[in-house]
Curated annotation (Swiss-Prot):
Protein name: RNA-binding E3 ubiquitin-protein ligase MEX3C
Subcellular location: Nucleus; Cytoplasm
Any matching Pfam family: zf-C3HC4_3
Zinc finger (RING-type): 601-641
Organism for this UniProt entry: Mus musculus
Main location: nucleus
Top-rank taxon, per record: Eukaryota
Organism ancestry: Eukaryota, Metazoa, Chordata, Craniata, Vertebrata
Amino acid sequence: MPSGSSAALALALAAAPAPLPQPPPLPPPPPAGGPELEGDGLLLRERLAALGLDDPSPAEPGAPALRAAAVAAAAAAQCQARRATGLAPEEPGRLATSETAELELEVDEEEGEEAELDGELLEEEELEEAEEEDRPSLLLLSPPAATASQTQPIPGGPLGSVLLPAAGFDAREAAAAGVLYGGDDAQGMMAAMLSHAYGPGGGGAAAAALNGEQAALLRRKSVNTTECVPVPSSEHVAEIVGRQGCKIKALRAKTNTYIKTPVRGEEPIFVVTGRKEDVAMAKREILSAAEHFSMIRASRNKNGPALGGLSCSPNLPGQTTVQVRVPYRVVGLVVGPKGATIKRIQQQTHTYIVTPSRDKEPVFEVTGMPENVDRAREEIEMHIAMRTGNYIELNEENDFHYNGTDVSFEGGTLGSAWLSSNPVPPSRARMMSNYRNDSSSSLGSGSTDSYFGSNRLADFSPTSPFSTGNFWFGDTLPSVGSEDLTVDSPAFDSLPTSAQTIWTPFEPVNPLSGFGSDPSGNMKTQRRGSQPSTPRLSPTFPESIEHPLARRVRSDPPSTGNHVGLPIYIPAFSNGTNSYSSSNGGSTSSSPPESRRKHDCVICFENEVIAALVPCGHNLFCMECANKICEKRTPSCPVCQTAVTQAIQIHS
């Protein structure tokens, strides 16, 4: 048997094609049955035991050799297949040569047995590979063995794992090995990531990533910038900030920036903080708003009047602008808390009102339709009068000025003058309401508003339509001589108890006399040293002070001619400005009620005002009195002396 084996081996080697490149051949194996063959059989038996294969008949002669030949054939086939794909290294030369020789020797003799053994070996190898599929990551993540053990076969693993050294794996090879040995993609990726993390240089990569995040945060913080945006004036600041900061809050939200507004008294500079592009957008918005406001102011100043109180050219067709000048101390009063008062006036009158700034003249600019502008001006003046309690002081500076109008005897006109005899400090002064006319008529719906005393007698304002004489309530006015104009008549200390005797007759009383043409005779000054003990509702001049009216009458006579025979009538109501005043005397003076009473007829004082005269439109009468006026031979309005055609009833 040994000689036949040698001959068969020689013939197979001669007829075989050129083999793949092999390492240098080792000496030929000894004959079968020698000590080397026994050693090879032991080695194969150990490998079979490690692979879980039991020797079915160890005592049978020749069985170890057959089993060894079968294992060698399977190993050679797998090695050749893996060499073709480039995955397996070359086998050791000695093992490859001996096993190939044994394979070739037994091919011709025992083909059937070899095929059966090959089938059994392949089935068992597939079972073991299926078992190893559950733990591919254990193979990949196992720590590298010692250098001496790297070349030794690893028992218990598949055949490919025996031939592949564990220390030569990198991340890509680990992932490929995981897929090769049955592991799915998720496990292979996990193995690759873990091997990369625990591999050489993994700690340095993590530190580099951390440093990169910190650098990004620092760069993000460093992109914030701060820029100052100046505007022309504090008025521009107020326009940009808006009421209660509404505009600047919207700008902050729109641009995603923080905008610090300048404080009153500081430089008008906005400080904007945020990202560079956001700051640039906020700066453009602020400068655009400031430029827009500057253009509005420029056009307003161009069209504005040179003198206060005159209307300028309208901004829109049909609109006009009027400047209303007020005292410095009441600017805030007109504006109101947070602009509530001026806003209410704008809404009620349908106008646009520009409030004056602190460093400008106290002038309100009212823009709108002419009738609305007049109403707004009246509302402003009425609010000032009601809140401040406008009153007249008898001093040298106040020469009978009332509401900006100099009421005097200039120009040959005798204006009616009513004042209280004993003015008190402003805290105790009664309010002199400054009710203006409504645009619907000369007196308007509020023309009869007044404060009445205990005898229901109103004290009226200086202006009066009857400009031809001086009008007093009560009995006949004593003659006024050119030497003495100051009077001290006790007839005015008490009021008549019947109001009808005052209003209904309208009879002329003694005319004023003594107004001579010689101005030199009117220069005498006479003063009284006694203070009246009781306040008076009459127009009696105070005894301690010479009234400016008397002083003006002496210095400026009405005209060169004599005014003799001027009839004196009791005025029903004043025309123009309905400004009524009540007595502001001491404790014995009549005080106004807490609330205004209903509008009573100015003739009978009994019925409510429900009628108006046509065409003048004075709605001051009850229907009965209005009809009586129309039934007269020459019907005329008691207020303006205009001819009356009819009386109409007012439904409110």
